């Protein structure tokens, strides 16, 4: 496994230096919405987009940027770099684009999953997330429009051109996770809610529990009641309480590699080096030869 993208994360052995913030505010978007290179990606169910969206936005779903799922295959696996690039170019995204991703209602983790996909495509320094999504946008009087009234809906988008170097190394694979279960400086972190981590509820997965030695940090503890990312000070305390130390490389996972991207970006905002185990519990729980822990008891 290669190191994560140099230059986008900064960390030291005893303290953290904050990285550039991926979040933008509604006030920022009000000021910049008319810029030529701005691309808005709306994450939500199609009916919500049809009813209202920020003018000029393009509807997108995390599955649009994932391998089409065959029966029995893992859920929501990131597209190979060339296919991911071509898909994003089809949205009109190019090297000069500034992409702002937002959710329509409360889809925080699907939105961070889309943002992660852009980062893996090499566009991390040109990607932002609208903090609080469309509810926050509407709260400041931001304009919304129905698809039937949006003139941009009838305009065929010109494909973009992306030459940025992709970064598939931001995805940790199964072998990397197995090799680093007890490695110093590597924190395997489970972003699912507690009942799934403890193994009291298997959900839809073959086995219940968590990866041995993993830290528990439910993704929903990182966002406020109105679906904004918590402050850096609050997030620092949450990570410390979960047993994560400054300088650790965080490998986040969840059910299918979506909720874990909330943790991924929360950690990056603090300057941690972060990776996503894309296979997540969907993959680990299928491998009956791999150990699991339930309530700290290895099985």
Summary of predicted features, one role per range:
Residues 1-4:
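Positively charged n-region of N-terminal signal peptides that target proteins for export
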Residues 68, 134-212, 291-299:
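Active-site neighborhoods of enzymes that stabilize oxyanions during catalysis
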Residues 12-14:
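N-terminal signal peptide c-region/cleavage motif recognized by signal peptidases
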Residues 78-172, 200, 259-275, 279-282:
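Thiolate-centered catalytic microenvironments shared by cysteine-dependent enzyme domains
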Residues 43-44, 60-63, 102-105, 123, ...:
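Active-site-proximal beta-strand/loop segments in catalytic clefts of secreted hydrolases
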Residues 235-237, 242, 247-298:
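C-terminal soluble interaction/assembly domains
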Residues 20-22, 27-95, 178-242, 246:
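Positively charged, proline/Ser/Thr-rich regional signature most characteristic
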């Amino acid at each position: 496994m290669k190191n994560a993208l140099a230059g986008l994360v900064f960390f030291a052995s005893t303290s953290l230096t904050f990285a550039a913030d991926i979040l933008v505010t509604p006030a920022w978007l009000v000021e910049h919405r008319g810029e030529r290179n701005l691309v808005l990606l709306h994450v939500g169910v199609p009916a919500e987009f049809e009813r209202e969206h920020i003018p000029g936005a393009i509807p997108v779903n995390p599955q649009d940027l994932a391998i089409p799922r065959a029966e029995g295959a893992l859920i929501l696996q990131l597209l190979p770099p060339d296919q991911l690039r071509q898909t994003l170019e089809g949205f009109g995204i190019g090297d000069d684009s500034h992409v702002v991703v937002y959710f329509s209602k409360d889809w925080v983790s699907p939105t961070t999953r889309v943002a992660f996909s852009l980062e893996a495509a090499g566009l991390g320094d040109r990607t932002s997330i609208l903090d609080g999504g469309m509810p926050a946008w509407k709260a400041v009087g931001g304009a919304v429009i129905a698809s039937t009234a949006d003139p941009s809906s009838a305009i065929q988008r010109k494909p973009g051109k992306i030459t940025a170097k992709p970064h598939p190394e931001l995805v940790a694979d199964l072998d990397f996770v197995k090799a680093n279960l007890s490695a110093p400086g590597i924190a395997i972190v489970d972003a699912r809610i507690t009942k799934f981590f403890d193994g009291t509820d298997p959900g839809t997965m073959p086995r219940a529990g968590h990866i041995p030695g993993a830290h528990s940090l439910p993704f929903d503890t990182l966002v406020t009641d109105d679906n904004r990312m918590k402050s850096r000070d609050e997030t620092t305390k949450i990570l410390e309480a979960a047993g994560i130390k400054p300088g650790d490389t965080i490998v986040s996972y969840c059910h299918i590699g979506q909720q874990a991207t909330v943790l991924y970006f929360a950690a990056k905002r603090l300057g941690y080096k972060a990776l996503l185990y894309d296979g997540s519990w969907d993959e680990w729980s299928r491998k009956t030869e791999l150990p699991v822990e339930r309530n700290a008891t290895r099985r």
